[in-house]
């Protein structure tokens, strides 16, 4: 039997008699329901109503909060390019080196390395040094030392030997010779080279080949001749001293 009726389009419910309350209490005890359990009053709906959201009854703020559109946009961009690129890496340490007392300070090193490259602290308190060879793909053991600074200097020496002047070192290593001494040595080398050039003399051949009469009488005092090594100037007096005579047939005859 239906306990409701309609008035002016509104659906109303009949009052429940006291006898029915007794039956309701018995039914609640039968199904194990507590009398002190709270009751939820459900409203009546029209027949054309298909669904009802029960969460709206318990929501304290029925109006949903508007989302931050800027944050959603930033998150979507960060998913594509990466958070480190968009927001920056907060834990990143600047790679700029600051020199303090001749020591290069770069990125933060853990305490077990003593703040130096290629240095590690052993469990018994000493410091070990080793360097990686990129060409051979191996590690070179440099030994153990009493202090971290000694181990770091051993690493620097090995790095300079393996990688030359472009090696990254813990300490600022000066050149082998000061600039003044190196410049003086370079000047001495240049002077020695110039002296050697001055000492070089052109070797003159004693035998001269004459090819024409004009070559003989072009100059009264000198004979211009051409040799394999270059132009050679010879004097007529030198020919007389050597005991040679000139012949019109352009040959050289020795005196008898």
From Swiss-Prot:
Superkingdom: Eukaryota
Query: From the UniProt annotation, which stretches of this protein bind DNA?
Result: 115-172
The UniProt entry's GO CC annotations, sorted and at most eight, read: nucleus
Query: Quick one: a GO biological-process term for this protein?
Result: ethylene-activated signaling pathway
Q: Name one Pfam family in it.
A: AP2
What InterPro entries does UniProt report for this protein, alphabetically?
AP2/ERF_dom (IPR001471), AP2/ERF_dom_sf (IPR036955), DNA-bd_dom_sf (IPR016177)
Where does this protein reside within or beyond the cell? Nucleus
Q: Name one GO molecular function term.
A: DNA binding
Q: Which UniProt keywords apply?
A: Activator, DNA-binding, Ethylene signaling pathway, Nucleus, Transcription, Transcription regulation
SMART domains from the UniProt entry: AP2
Q: SUPFAM superfamilies given for it?
A: DNA-binding domain (SSF54171)
Report the family membership. Answer: Belongs to the AP2/ERF transcription factor family. ERF subfamily.
Q: What does this protein do?
A: Probably acts as a transcriptional activator. Binds to the GCC-box pathogenesis-related promoter element. May be involved in the regulation of gene expression by stress factors and by components of stress signal transduction pathways.
Give the matching PANTHER family.
AP2 DOMAIN CLASS TRANSCRIPTION FACTOR, ETHYLENE-RESPONSIVE TRANSCRIPTION FACTOR ERF084
Q: What is this protein called?
A: Ethylene-responsive transcription factor ERF084
Species whose genome carries this gene: Arabidopsis thaliana (Mouse-ear cress)
């Amino acid at each position: 039997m239906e306990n409701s009726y309609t008035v002016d389009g509104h659906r109303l419910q009949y009052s429940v008699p006291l006898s029915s309350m007794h039956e309701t209490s018995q039914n609640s005890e039968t199904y194990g329901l507590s009398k002190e359990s709270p009751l939820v009053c459900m409203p009546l709906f029209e027949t054309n109503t298909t669904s009802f959201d029960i969460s709206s009854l318990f929501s304290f703020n029925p109006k949903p909060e508007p989302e931050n559109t800027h944050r959603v946009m930033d998150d979507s961009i960060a998913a594509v390019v990466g958070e480190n690129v968009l927001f920056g890496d907060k834990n990143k340490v600047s790679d700029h080196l600051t020199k303090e007392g001749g020591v290069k300070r770069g990125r933060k090193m853990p305490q077990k390395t003593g703040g130096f490259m290629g240095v590690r602290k052993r469990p018994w308190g000493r410091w070990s040094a080793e360097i990686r060879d990129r060409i051979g793909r191996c590690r070179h053991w440099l030994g153990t030392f009493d202090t971290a600074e000694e181990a770091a200097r051993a690493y620097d020496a090995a790095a300079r030997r393996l990688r030359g002047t472009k090696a990254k070192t813990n300490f600022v290593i000066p050149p082998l010779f000061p600039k003044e001494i190196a410049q003086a040595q370079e000047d001495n080398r240049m002077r020695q080279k110039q002296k050697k050039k001055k000492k070089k003399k052109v070797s003159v051949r004693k035998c001269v080949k004459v090819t024409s009469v004009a070559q003989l009488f072009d100059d009264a005092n000198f004979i211009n001749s051409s040799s394999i090594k270059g132009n050679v100037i010879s004097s007529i007096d030198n020919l007389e001293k050597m005991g040679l005579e000139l012949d019109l047939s352009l040959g050289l005859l020795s005196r008898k």
